[in-house]
UniProtKB/Swiss-Prot annotation:
<keyword id="KW-0819">tRNA processing</keyword>
<feature type="binding site">
    <location>
        <begin position="24"/>
        <end position="31"/>
    </location>
    <ligand>
        <name>ATP</name>
    </ligand>
</feature>
<feature type="region of interest" description="Interaction with tRNA">
    <location>
        <begin position="163"/>
        <end position="165"/>
    </location>
</feature>
<protein>
    <recommendedName>
        <fullName>tRNA-specific 2-thiouridylase MnmA</fullName>
        <ecNumber>2.8.1.13</ecNumber>
    </recommendedName>
</protein>
<dbReference type="Pfam" id="PF20258">
    <property type="entry name" value="tRNA_Me_trans_C"/>
</dbReference>
<dbReference type="GO" id="GO:0005524">
    <property type="term" value="F:ATP binding"/>
</dbReference>
<feature type="binding site">
    <location>
        <position position="50"/>
    </location>
    <ligand>
        <name>ATP</name>
    </ligand>
</feature>
<comment type="similarity">
    <text>Belongs to the MnmA/TRMU family.</text>
</comment>
<feature type="binding site">
    <location>
        <position position="141"/>
    </location>
    <ligand>
        <name>ATP</name>
    </ligand>
</feature>
<dbReference type="GO" id="GO:0005737">
    <property type="term" value="C:cytoplasm"/>
</dbReference>
<dbReference type="InterPro" id="IPR014729">
    <property type="entry name" value="Rossmann-like_a/b/a_fold"/>
</dbReference>
<feature type="active site" description="Cysteine persulfide intermediate">
    <location>
        <position position="213"/>
    </location>
</feature>
<feature type="site" description="Interaction with tRNA">
    <location>
        <position position="142"/>
    </location>
</feature>
<keyword id="KW-0694">RNA-binding</keyword>
<keyword id="KW-1015">Disulfide bond</keyword>
<keyword id="KW-0963">Cytoplasm</keyword>
<feature type="active site" description="Nucleophile">
    <location>
        <position position="117"/>
    </location>
</feature>
């Protein structure tokens, strides 16, 4: 059966039995199959799981990197036959991801903690672990492809577009890509389930992790615990500054939101902006949410775009993509993206990821 699931060699100049691979294991089906597949292909596999939160027993069911998932990862490693280590990264994760999540909401923005986690914890620190252990590559179960052409490494969308995770990996650097490998990018999720059963993994039918891993309650309750000031009452105003009502905390709102405003009005109202300086939620009609111009900060380019380059951009993970043009700005490490067509509800704090065909050329964080 393995002949049906051929992958590119992890290293072109080393045979599998000479290649040491660290596999980041979350306890889910994907990373477990990645590890089992490489082991069965003859690679020297070492599984590593990061304990990111939940040592107090409060991990949410269906999350990753905590609680039962850590035991699942260890059990898979033991049943297949390769070593597995658990590293406690709770303090780093709390500072770099959880606190950033709350602070981003406090700035009136909508965060993507999965990108921050990859950027500041999983890739940065696990790559260092990979080097410390004298391994050749770091492998993950992400649905994304890494292609080498003419000595250049490219990050590309997965074959399975319904599972593609390239949006969440836009902050990956060229240096990191040299050591990273994504063996599942050329397969469909259904293939991975088949492989899990073939390898006899007890987690073959385990559901995919859903939502933000460390949020055990609602977003608002989680953030309220981290930043109590986020639930202070304030005014709801229209785009002209007229007071329309009162809100129970900016944490309960995000740009583009319609539900939960509790305001009687002659037309539907949406959240246009969250003004954190005076604790106001600004609302308005749908046309006030339509825009073409986006300012992007903290840029990471895997391929430097030319001035006026035409690309496809994704403005949220579920976005199919919009045609756009990229321009430089006078501000350092910022870019201006002009969409061909108006887009609804562009949210500061989300990522703007640029593609050239299937290739991720980079992106940044939306300012406005």
């Amino acid at each position: 059966m393995l002949k049906e699931f051929e992958i590119e060699p992890l290293l072109k100049d080393k045979a599998p039995h000479q290649t040491k691979a660290i596999v980041a294991m979350s306890g889910g089906v994907d990373s477990s199959v990645a590890a089992a597949l490489l082991y069965n292909l003859g690679y020297e596999v070492i599984g590593v799981t990061l304990q990111l939160y939940g040592s107090d027993g409060n991990a949410r069911k269906g999350a990753c990197c905590a609680g039962q998932d850590i035991y699942d990862a260890k059990y898979v490693a033991e049943s297949v036959g390769f070593p597995h280590y658990i590293l406690n990264y709770e303090e780093i994760f709390k500072k770099e991801v959880i606190e950033d999540f709350a602070n981003t909401y406090m700035r009136g923005e909508t965060p993507i903690p999965c990108v921050r986690c990859n950027q500041t914890v999983k890739f940065r620190d696990l790559l260092q672990v990979t080097k410390n252990l004298g391994a050749d590559v770091l492998v993950t179960g992400h649905y994304v492809r890494r292609l080498e052409e003419n000595g250049e490494v490219k990050l590309c969308r997965s074959i399975d577009k319904s599972k593609d995770q390239s949006y969440f990996l836009f902050a990956t650097t060229e240096e990191q890509l040299k050591l990273l490998r994504f063996p599942l990018g050329g397969f469909y999720k259904s293939d991975i389930r088949k492989l899990a059963k073939y390898f006899g993994l007890q987690i073959s039918e385990k559901p995919d992790s859903q939502d933000i891993c460390f949020v055990s309650e609602s977003y608002s309750k989680t953030i309220a615990k981290l930043a109590p000031q986020s639930v202070q009452k304030g005014k709801i105003v229209d785009i002209h500054g007229k007071v329309l009502g009162e809100h129970s905390g900016i944490v309960n709102f995000t740009v583009g939101q319609r539900r939960g405003l509790c305001i009687a009005h002659n037309e539907p109202l949406y959240v246009i902006k969250i003004n954190t300086e005076n604790n106001e939620v600004v609302v308005g009609p749908i046309n006030a949410l339509m825009q073409k111009k986006i300012l992007v900060k903290e840029l990471n380019w895997l391929e430097q775009p030319k001035e006026g380059m035409e690309v496809t951009v994704k403005l949220r993970s579920s976005h199919a993509g919009s045609s756009a043009t990229i321009y430089s700005t006078d501000e350092k490490n910022k870019a201006c993206v002009i969409l061909n067509d108006d887009y609804f509800g562009i949210s500061p704090g989300q990522a703007c990821v640029a593609y050239k065909g299937e290739q991720v050329i980079g992106g940044g964080w939306i300012c406005s």
